[in-house]
Design a protein with these regions (language model features):
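Accessory beta-strand-rich segments of carbohydrate-active enzymes
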Residues: 1-135
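Generic detector of well-ordered secondary structure
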Residues: 4, 150-151
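Long, well-ordered, tryptophan-enriched scaffold segments
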Residues: 137-140, 153-154
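Edge strands and adjacent loops of beta-rich recognition modules
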Residues: 152-174
């Protein structure tokens, strides 16, 4: 089971496959009060040996343009952007239970690697800009060489996370 959230929006990948079944995860929230997370059962996607978990993270509601934001002068510079913050962030916990009864939790931390990919801009209102020349083939597969990527910078802890987000059909995102 993997639990994931973002200050912004994310698209979760495991072993080269997209895990996230919805767009704009984890969903809108007033980031000053709460942050939702989603839980995904990835049991069938885990493989023996090495696995690779990663995410594409974008501004979303956290630091992107908000509806009517520019017209109403929202945000620190009255541009309609950065209403809640400037830098998107991602958090994940992968819970693994082995057949012998032992378990392991893999957390996002400074051992994770980050880079800029082909999505050079991704905003809910301004749209996405995609530069295919910057594609990173195989970036979420085991053995990918990310040695030229930067180390992730851990975000400061918040007061806590809310219960899992449910989509509009009332089902838990799994």
């Amino acid at each position: 089971l993997v639990h994931a959230t973002a200050l912004g929006i994310y698209d979760l990948h495991l072993n080269g496959e997209r895990v996230t079944g919805n767009y704009f995860a984890p969903g809108w929230t007033d980031y000053r009060r709460s942050v939702y997370y989603n839980s995904y059962d990835v049991t069938s996607r885990l493989q023996e040996g090495s696995n690779c978990l990663g995410a594409v993270v974008a501004d979303g509601w956290y630091s992107g343009y908000l509806p009517s934001g520019k017209a109403k002068g929202y945000g620190p510079y009255r541009t309609g952007r950065n209403m809640y913050g400037k830098n998107p962030a991602f958090l994940a916990q992968l819970h693994i239970e082995y057949e012998d009864g032992t378990s392991q939790i893999v957390l996002t931390d400074s051992s994770w690697k980050v880079t800029t990919g082909p999505e050079t801009a991704a905003d809910l209102l301004a749209g996405e800009q995609y530069d295919a020349r910057k594609e990173l083939a195989g970036w979420s597969t085991p053995g990918y060489d990310a040695s030229k990527w930067n180390d992730a910078i851990p975000a400061t802890k918040s007061k806590g996370l809310n219960p899992p987000f449910s989509d509009k059909t009332g089902t838990r995102a799994t």
